[in-house]
C-alpha cells in the first residue's frame, strides 16, 4: 500500500468519476485541472455551461511530507474555485484536508449549479489497482501527449485478474464506502478492472430507507419524562429546565419566607409531594386575621418585613422571631417546631 490522494466526482458529469494520484518519488509535482484535455491532467467537463470552466482552472501541488503527501490547491480561473463553499483568492494556495469539498466554477449546490464538485480524500492503496496518475503534464513538453496520464501497471508475469475476483467487494467500492458522508450524495462510483474491459458500473445500491426494512425494537421509555408527568402540577417543574433530572431540583428549602406584606394562602409547597400526606399544608395567615402564628407565645413582630418558617414535621407556619431561631439556621437545616420535637423524643 502506498500513500495516494483522490478526487471523487459528486453529481453528474461527462468525465471520470474517480481520479487517483500517486506522485513520483522526489520533492513534489503539480497537477492541472481544467477544460483543456491536452494541457490538464484532470479534464473538467460540466454538463451545463462549460464556459464557466477555464482552460487551466486550478492546480494541485503535491509535496512529500514524511510518509504522506501535503496537497495544496491554487486557483487560476475567472469564475472561481471554492473549498468547503469558501472562495479561494486567485493565485492563493490552500492546503487541503481529507474530506474537503472542491467546487470548480460559480458557487451553488450540486445538481443545480453549472460547476464541477469533487471530494478530496487521502488514502493508502495499490496505485495499479486504480490506474493512478503518476507523471503530471506540467513536467512534460507542451506538445507531448503521452506525458499526462501514465497508469502504474503490474510487472510482467503478474496475474491479470479483474478486481471482482480478488475480493467479494471491489477495492474501489471499499474506499468509497469508507466515507460516511458520501452515502447521502447518491453517488454511482465506477470500479476499475485490470483486465482491459474498462470501467464497470457496480449494481445499483438501495437507498438507506429501503435497506432498513426490519422493524426496530421500541425505544426505551424515558424515565425522566415519566417522572415529569408525575410532578407536572408542581411549581418546580414549571421553573426548572427539562434537561435537569427531578432529583436535582431543590426539594424543600424555600419554606423560609421574608415578606414585606403578609403571605397569602395561594401557592403549593415546593418539592416532591408526600406519598401519605398527614395534613394539608397551611399557608401563613394574613395580617390582622386571627392568630399571627402557631407559636404558644406569639410576640407579634412589628417590623416592616416579617420572616416566616414552616415546620418540616407538621407543616405549620411560625414567625422566625417567635420560635427563637435565625434565618440562616432555618435555611440550612430542617426546622421542627417544639411540638414535633417532643413527639420525636417520646
UniProtKB/Swiss-Prot annotation:
Organism: Sus scrofa (Pig)
Localisation: Nucleus
Protein known as: Transcription factor 19
Modified residues (Phosphoserine): 78
Matching SUPFAM superfamilies: FYVE/PHD zinc finger (SSF57903), SMAD/FHA domain (SSF49879)
InterPro entries: FHA_dom, SMAD_FHA_dom_sf, TCF19, TCF19_PHD, Zinc_finger_PHD-type_CS, Znf_FYVE_PHD, Znf_PHD, Znf_PHD-finger
Biological process (GO), any one: regulation of gene expression
Protein purpose: Potential transcription factor that may play a role in the regulation of genes involved in cell cycle G1/S transition. May bind to regulatory elements of genes, including the promoter of the transcription factor FOXO1.
Biased composition (Polar residues): 190-208
GO CC annotations, alphabetized: nucleus
UniProt gene name: TCF19
Keywords: Metal-binding, Nucleus, Phosphoprotein, Transcription, Transcription regulation, Zinc, Zinc-finger
Amino acid at each position: 500500500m502506498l500513500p495516494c490522494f483522490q478526487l471523487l466526482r459528486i453529481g453528474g458529469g461527462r468525465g471520470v468519476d474517480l481520479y487517483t494520484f500517486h506522485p513520483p518519488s522526489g520533492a513534489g509535482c503539480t497537477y492541472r485541472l481544467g477544460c483543456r484535455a491536452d494541457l490538464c491532467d484532470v479534464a473538467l467537463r460540466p454538463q451545463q455551461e462549460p464556459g464557466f470552466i477555464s482552460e487551466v482552472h486550478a492546480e494541485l501541488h503535491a509535496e512529500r511530507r514524511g510518509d504522506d503527501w501535503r496537497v495544496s490547491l491554487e486557483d487560476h480561473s475567472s469564475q472561481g474555485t471554492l473549498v468547503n463553499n469558501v472562495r479561494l483568492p486567485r493565485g492563493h494556495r490552500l492546503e487541503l484536508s481529507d474530506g474537503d469539498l472542491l467546487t470548480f466554477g460559480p458557487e451553488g449546490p450540486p445538481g443545480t449549479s453549472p460547476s464541477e464538485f469533487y471530494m478530496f480524500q487521502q488514502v493508502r492503496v495499490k496505485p495499479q489497482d486504480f490506474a493512478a496518475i503518476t507523471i503530471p503534464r506540467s513536467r512534460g513538453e507542451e506538445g507531448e501527449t503521452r506525458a499526462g496520464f501514465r497508469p502504474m501497471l503490474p510487472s510482467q508475469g503478474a496475474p491479470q485478474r479483474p478486481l471482482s475476483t480478488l475480493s467479494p467487494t471491489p477495492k474501489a467500492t471499499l474506499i468509497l464506502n469508507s466515507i460516511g458522508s458520501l452515502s447521502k450524495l447518491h453517488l454511482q462510483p465506477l470500479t476499475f478492472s485490470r483486465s482491459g474491459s474498462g470501467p464497470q458500473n457496480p449494481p445499483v445500491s438501495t437507498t438507506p430507507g429501503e435497506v432498513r426494512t426490519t422493524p426496530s425494537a421500541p425505544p426505551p421509555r424515558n424515565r425522566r419524562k415519566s417522572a415529569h408527568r408525575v410532578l407536572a402540577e408542581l411549581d418546580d417543574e414549571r421553573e426548572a429546565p427539562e434537561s435537569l433530572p427531578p432529583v436535582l431540583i431543590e426539594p424543600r428549602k424555600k419554606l423560609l419566607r421574608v415578606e414585606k406584606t403578609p403571605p397569602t394562602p395561594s401557592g403549593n409547597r415546593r418539592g416532591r409531594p408526600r406519598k401519605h400526606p398527614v395534613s394539608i399544608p397551611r399557608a401563613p395567615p394574613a395580617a390582622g386575621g386571627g392568630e399571627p402564628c402557631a407559636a404558644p407565645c406569639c410576640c407579634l413582630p412589628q417590623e416592616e418585613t416579617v420572616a416566616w418558617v414552616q415546620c418540616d414535621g407538621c407543616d405549620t407556619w411560625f414567625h422566625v422571631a417567635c420560635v427563637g431561631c435565625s434565618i440562616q439556621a432555618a435555611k440550612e437545616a430542617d426546622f421542627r417546631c417544639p411540638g414535633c420535637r417532643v413527639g420525636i423524643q417520646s
